Amino acid sequence: MSTVVSEGRNGGNERYSPQDELPDLENLKLTDDMRVPSFDRLPSPTPRYYGSCKWFNVSKGYGFVIDDITREDLFVHQSNLNMQGFRSLDEGERVSYYIQERSNGKGREAYAVSGEVEGQGLKGSRIHPLGRKKAVSLRCFRCGKFATHKAKSCPNVKTDAKVCYTCGSEEHVSSICPERRRKHRPEQVAAEEAEAARLAAETAASSPRGDHDD
């Protein structure tokens, strides 16, 4: 750190450093008005209120509680519930909470929701929603199975030719499969066979005829 010569001290012969202006940190002691307050002793943002769960939708993750004093319906979201794992409330469950205005302006909501004793965990609902399927099953028209693959990438059929997805045969397609006669109603099978015959006749009529010898 640079030093300068003070002109007003000892006829300009005393050396002076800006560090001389810093307080003596070694002997500095905190006074009561300088101490950092303990957050454990800070007052709560609002009074603690008490009520009961009116209803709670476990699938959507929200519901309402009824305040004991005002009988007001207060919105409650699962993210404000003091519990581990799947968070929900059981109908009629006793709770304590703070109250604040909702961010969307639609009334008030309960937050920091716990049991009747502040910080106590909640029991939660006995109903849990069914888990969502991780994959959607589609029917592959090449192998006929319900799976997550598509026909163009079917792992069950090794040939590029059309196959019957009812029985897997390469000799015919599903519309004229003998297995369908056994599994479906006779009138449905008859209609499908008639349609298949009509298509075959149209194909034969449109095919070029070869020259025949007399």
Swiss-Prot record:
Coiled coil: none annotated. Its main location: cytoplasm. CDD domains: CSP_CDS. Zn(2+) 2 binds at C164, C167, H172, C177. Residues 48-116 form the CSD domain. It is found in: Cytoplasm. Zn(2+) 1 binds at C140, C143, H149, C154. Keywords: Cytoplasm, Developmental protein, Metal-binding, Repeat, Zinc, Zinc-finger. The gene is lin-28. A zinc finger (CCHC-type) spans 139-156, 162-179. Pfam families: CSD (PF00313), zf-CCHC (PF00098). Residues 1-22, 178-214 are annotated as: Disordered. Heterochronic protein which controls the choice of stage specific cell fates. Regulates the timing of the second larval stage events (L2 events) in the hypodermis. One of its GO terms (cellular component) is cytoplasm. Belongs to the lin-28 family. InterPro entries: CSD (IPR011129), CSP_DNA-bd (IPR002059), Lin-28_RNA-binding (IPR051373), NA-bd_OB-fold (IPR012340), Znf_CCHC (IPR001878), Znf_CCHC_sf (IPR036875). The keyword DNA-binding does not apply. This is Protein lin-28. GO terms for molecular function: enzyme binding; mRNA binding; zinc ion binding. One of its GO terms (biological process) is cell fate specification.
